Amino acid sequence: MIKFLVKGQNIETLEHEIIAADQIAFVKIHFVFDNNWKPLHKVVQFTQDEITYNRVLGTENTSCFLPAELTAGTVKMSLFGYDAEATETVRATTVVKTLHIRPSGFEGENNNVPPTPDLYQQLLEKISEKGKDGKSAYEIAV
């Protein structure tokens, strides 16, 4: 398991293992948040070669899978969070944590990787899940 503590604007490693390339929905990253982060809507960002992949955690989730598009090399990971209930804009950010992905031994015919949904798609999915309990969009918003 890979586990990080998000404390203030810093990401500290709690548990780490070697990450190999070519994984799909296999490497799970778990976060422990300090009290300042707990009420925030959280998003993890993974950046490699100037391409950023977002994983929405929301307010309840504390883990996500590493995006399958990441290849061997270095990856910059950071988080941001915002308080949708606040009267003034609140956005928390972290410094970048560098992850290292090693080449795998995978040699397969089908190297197609399903794309990670972009941030907008993930947020729409969260909104549609909220409406399943019979509440209207207005009731969800207030």
Please place each PLM-identified region on the residue numbering:
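Collagen/collagen-like triple-helix sequence repeat recognition
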Residues: 102-142
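N-terminal assembly/attachment segments of tailed bacteriophage virion structural proteins
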Residues: 1-108
